[in-house]
């Protein structure tokens, strides 16, 4: 049966379109390269122990004074706030393209604290009939409407064709079909969103990739209830070798938003509409499209939706969060208990090893020997020929060991090397205890 050359038209009959172009080829899978492009897990960097004066980088951070903690907190909080702000601006409130079908009603609900203006730009056919409404509160979804489209098709082999419909929750779609090619069949699907359509195009024979999937022949109809507001694609596909002729009648019972109380409406006189969002006010916008038009096989409408951020809100939020964390950090540092090691007098840079017995060389030597005994853990036992090196600095092997660490008391380095260890690592190389102070030993 051939396609009719002319189609009857009347005011009561739905728009009828003869489809001769606009078909797409299916994407055959199996040509992937086989590479897995997922990110590799991050490398784990092992920590190095202290060896002969080398310092672990992570230990340098531990030695920072408590006076630097608030500034570190400021840097961390500022970085976190900037990351969250960029995520909101580029992600949740980033620029997106909205595809609508006939009689669409798309709700836009910006957050008034972070959004100052809603900008909608018409793409594609200029003057297509899109209208942007502004309301003081979210409108009711209670306006019922019906429309239908009839399409005559001659689907080539290994091709498909689709029609977009933006449907709100509570709508209903009925698709009637009549396959005129005897002994032939087509795939008829209803896919949710671009992702659902793309999955079906990659493998048309899989029934679990779309909301509705049928193999049609002869005549009949399918129905589908809509439970989520989104864009939906009604598509037919031919994976066989011969061309298939068919008639597709799409009937929609839609639910639209009520825009009778709108205080703002814009019909895109300059291909762009800007809706100002009041601060701390309930606001909503609705983008609508006209009904189906005759001799328009697609009835598609495209608009670019973007948001102008309210920068002052981001700055104030960052300041408040930073101030709160600084206060919490300050209170936490003040309430930390003072340990016994921190009570050591650190203002006395030079002090005798044994108070009251500075003139007693034998007592000083006895105490000095007892300190040096503990260094065998680091140096190990040496022969008599190496006894002279046991009293040299274990770091530079040049100067004598003339200092010890508080609070552990180990003596393994000269005063210069010991000071450098305290300033860089901050931990005793023998027992790994934190160095509170480096005391110099004077031979009197």
Swiss-Prot record:
Keywords tagged on the record: Membrane, Metal-binding, Transferase, Transmembrane, Transmembrane helix, Ubl conjugation pathway, Zinc, Zinc-finger
Cited Gene3D superfamilies: Zinc/RING finger domain, C3HC4 (zinc finger) (3.30.40.10)
Cellular-component GO terms for this entry: endosome; plant-type vacuole membrane
Tissue expression: Expressed in the shoot apical meristems (SAM), root tips, pollen and inflorescences.
Keyword Acetylation: no
Regions of compositional bias (Basic and acidic residues) in chain numbering: 17-41
Top-level EC class: transferase
Residue intervals passing through the bilayer: 74-94, 312-332
Cellular location(s): Endomembrane system
Superkingdom to which the source organism belongs: Eukaryota
Catalytic activity: S-ubiquitinyl-[E2 ubiquitin-conjugating enzyme]-L-cysteine + [acceptor protein]-L-lysine = [E2 ubiquitin-conjugating enzyme]-L-cysteine + N(6)-ubiquitinyl-[acceptor protein]-L-lysine
Annotated stretches, region: Disordered: 1-41
Annotated InterPro entries: APD1-4_M, APD1-4_N, Znf_RING, Znf_RING/FYVE/PHD
Alphabetized GO MF terms: ubiquitin-protein transferase activity; zinc ion binding
Principal localisation: membrane
Residue ranges, compositional bias (Low complexity): 1-15
Disruption phenotype: No obvious defects during the vegetative developmental stage. The double mutant lacking both APD1 and APD2 exhibits an increased percentage of bicellular-like pollen at the mature pollen stage. Plants lacking APD1, APD2, APD3 and APD4 are defective for cell division in male gametogenesis resulting in severe abnormal bicellular-like pollen phenotypes.
Coiled-coil segments: none
EC number: 2.3.2.27
Mode of membrane association: Multi-pass membrane protein
PANTHER family: E3 UBIQUITIN-PROTEIN LIGASE APD2 (PTHR46858:SF8), OS05G0521000 PROTEIN (PTHR46858)
Annotated function: Exhibits E2-dependent E3 ligase activity. Involved in pollen mitosis II (PMII) regulation during male gametogenesis.
Name recorded for this polypeptide: E3 ubiquitin-protein ligase APD2
Organism: Arabidopsis thaliana (Mouse-ear cress)
Gene it is expressed from: APD2
């Amino acid at each position: 049966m051939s396609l009719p050359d002319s189609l009857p038209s009347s005011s009561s009959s739905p728009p009828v379109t003869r489809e001769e172009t606009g078909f797409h080829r299916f994407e055959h899978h199996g040509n992937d390269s086989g590479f897995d492009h997922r990110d590799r897990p991050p490398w784990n960097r092992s920590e190095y122990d202290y060896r002969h004066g080398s310092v672990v980088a992570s230990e340098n951070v531990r030695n920072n004074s408590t006076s630097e903690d608030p500034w570190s907190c400021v840097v961390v909080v500022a970085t976190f706030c900037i990351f969250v702000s960029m995520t909101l601006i580029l992600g949740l409130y980033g620029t997106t393209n909205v595809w609508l079908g006939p009689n669409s009603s798309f709700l836009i609900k910006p957050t008034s604290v972070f959004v100052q203006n809603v900008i909608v730009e018409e793409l594609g056919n200029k003057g297509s009939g899109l209208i942007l409404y502004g309301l003081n509160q979210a409108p009711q979804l209670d306006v019922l409407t019906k429309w239908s489209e009839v399409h005559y098709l001659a689907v080539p082999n290994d091709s498909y064709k689709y029609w977009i419909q933006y449907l709100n929750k509570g709508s209903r779609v009925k698709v009637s079909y009549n396959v005129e090619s005897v002994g032939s069949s087509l795939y008829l699907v209803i896919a949710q969103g671009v992702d659902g359509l793309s999955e079906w195009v990659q493998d048309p024979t899989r029934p679990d990739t779309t909301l509705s999937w049928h193999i049609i022949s002869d005549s009949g109809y399918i129905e589908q209830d809509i439970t989520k507001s989104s864009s939906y694609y009604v598509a037919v596909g031919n994976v066989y070798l011969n061309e298939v002729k068919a008639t597709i009648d799409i009937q929609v019972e839609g639910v639209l938003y009520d825009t009778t109380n709108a205080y703002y409406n814009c019909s895109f006189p300059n291909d762009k509409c800007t809706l100002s969002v009041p601060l701390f006010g309930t606001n909503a916008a609705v983008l609508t499209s006209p009904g189906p038009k005759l001799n328009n096989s697609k009835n598609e409408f495209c608009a670019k939706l973007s948001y102008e951020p309210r920068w002052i809100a981001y700055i104030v939020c960052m300041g408040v969060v930073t101030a709160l964390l600084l206060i919490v950090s300050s209170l936490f540092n003040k309430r930390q208990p003072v340990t016994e090691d921190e009570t050591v007098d650190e203002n006395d840079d030079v002090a005798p090893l044994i108070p009251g017995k500075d003139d007693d060389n034998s007592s000083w030597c006895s105490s000095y020997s007892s300190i040096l005994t503990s260094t065998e853990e680091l140096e190990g036992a040496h022969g008599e020929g190496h006894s002279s090196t046991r009293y040299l600095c274990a770091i530079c092997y040049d100067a004598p060991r003339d200092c010890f660490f508080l609070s552990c008391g180990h003596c393994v380095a000269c005063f210069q090397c010991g000071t450098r260890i305290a300033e860089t690592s901050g931990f005793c190389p023998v027992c790994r205890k934190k160095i509170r102070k480096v005391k110099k030993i004077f031979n009197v």
